[in-house]
């Protein structure tokens, strides 16, 4: 693998396996974790690369590569055009999604590149693979794979494209998290599948086994840093952008996944969590998220309060009168919820130096006063 210098700092890699009559050496099984990602296939554009490869293979001027001395060229004469193999395309599409997670000829499950061929029942005598990341178009990635200006050590992709032992190719292309990933799978097959199928340009969720040892640092985003609620009250909670660090990933810091994390509340005596958060008793607790056996370092605070413990001193909003009750309003100092309390009516006070204090209705008082005035 080597780094190519251009706007995106793009990467290439190639592999070739020849004379595969001997079965693969079986490796010890690697512990894997199923990781789901959403990719956008771009097979209509990917298929246009076939003509570009064949133009190069059949050109009298372009079908060459440097010898190891870097001073003389090997010219590839009488190369036959490659056929498009739709079985190989399926394998290339799978590999394109896999290199979006780990950019390597070693698959995310730690198996050899060509194990993907056998998993898709693609049998061959010779096989090779070119991979690339970051190129936005079929033309640009093909130009990169051609390696016109490289010396022998840098023309591995070119030699795959010009290999006389191959008779077919399948090409895969996915767009994931802002980057394009491309795969060319070459082979010699006795029976090439040339039966056309519709080009897949769909957005698809795939579950890919990833070596557990390569996964670390689960991250998540809560919709709130803190959830404040009253006892007996429920509130919604949501998370977004679940992502993991994967050793060997190219393009961005994290692999964003579509799997749903598990949410756990630390103290269920304060609040419970079942789709939403419900306050149980006054106190503080936290919510954590976990996925693939990893716990995110991000947490969300949960604060539950009982308004009965947090009313202010209150203020009179409706003063009482002699005949009407008043209203006093209290406000919770935590959530600003309010409650009201009735204030008793003031009543009447008739006591004086010349009258007898007598409780009476207002109308009666008027009559008494009227009679008193008459007496004076």
Where do the PLM segments sit?
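Bacterial N-terminal signal peptides that target proteins for export
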Residues: 2-12
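Short, well-ordered surface patches within globular domains
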Residues: 29-120, 158, 164-169
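A well-ordered secondary-structure block
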Residues: 94-98, 110-193
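Disulfide-bonded cysteine-rich modules in secreted/extracellular proteins
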Residues: 195-204, 215-220, 306-325, 346-358
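Extracytoplasmic soluble-region selector
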Residues: 212-309, 325-328, 333, 337-341, ...
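Bacterial N-terminal signal peptides
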Residues: 11-21
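Low-complexity, Gly/Ser/Thr/Pro-rich intrinsically disordered linker/tail segments
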Residues: 180-216
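Sec-dependent signal peptide cleavage junction
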Residues: 20-31
């Amino acid at each position: 693998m080597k780094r190519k210098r251009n706007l995106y700092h793009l990467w290439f890699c190639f592999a070739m396996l020849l004379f595969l009559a001997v079965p693969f050496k079986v490796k010890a099984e690697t512990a894997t974790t199923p990781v789901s990602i959403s990719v956008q296939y771009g097979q209509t554009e990917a298929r246009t690369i076939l003509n570009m490869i064949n133009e190069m293979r059949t050109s009298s001027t372009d079908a060459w590569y440097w010898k190891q001395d870097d001073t003389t060229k090997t010219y590839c004469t009488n190369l036959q055009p490659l056929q498009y193999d739709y079985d190989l395309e399926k394998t290339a599409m799978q590999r394109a999604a896999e290199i979006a997670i780990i950019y390597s000829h070693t698959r995310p499950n730690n198996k050899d590149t060509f194990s993907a061929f056998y998993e898709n029942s693609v049998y061959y005598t010779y096989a090779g693979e070119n991979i690339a990341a970051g190129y936005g178009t079929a033309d640009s990635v093909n130009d990169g794979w051609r390696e016109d200006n490289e010396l022998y050590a840098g023309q591995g992709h070119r030699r795959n494209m010009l290999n006389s032992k191959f008779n077919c190719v399948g090409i895969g292309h996915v767009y994931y998290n802002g980057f394009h990933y491309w795969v060319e799978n070459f082979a010699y097959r006795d029976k090439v599948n040339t039966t056309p199928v519709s080009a897949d340009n769909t957005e698809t969720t795939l579950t890919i086994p990833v070596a557990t040892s390569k996964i670390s640092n689960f991250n998540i985003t809560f919709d709130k840093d803190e959830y404040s609620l009253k006892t007996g009250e429920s509130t919604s909670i949501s998370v977004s952008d679940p992502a993991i660090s994967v050793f060997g990933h190219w393009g961005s810091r994290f692999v964003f996944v579509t799997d749903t994390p598990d949410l756990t509340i630390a103290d269920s005596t304060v609040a419970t969590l079942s789709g939403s958060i419900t306050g149980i008793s006054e106190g503080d607790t936290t919510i954590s998220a976990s996925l693939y056996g990893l716990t995110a370092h991000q947490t969300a605070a949960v604060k539950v309060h009982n308004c009965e413990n947090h009313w202010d001193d209150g203020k009179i909003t409706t003063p009482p009168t002699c005949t009407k009750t008043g209203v006093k309003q209290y406000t919770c100092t935590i959530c600003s919820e309010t409650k009201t309390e009735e204030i008793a009516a003031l009543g009447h006070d008739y006591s004086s130096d010349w009258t007898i204090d007598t409780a009476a209705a207002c109308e009666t008082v008027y009559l008494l006063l009227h009679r008193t005035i008459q007496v004076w």
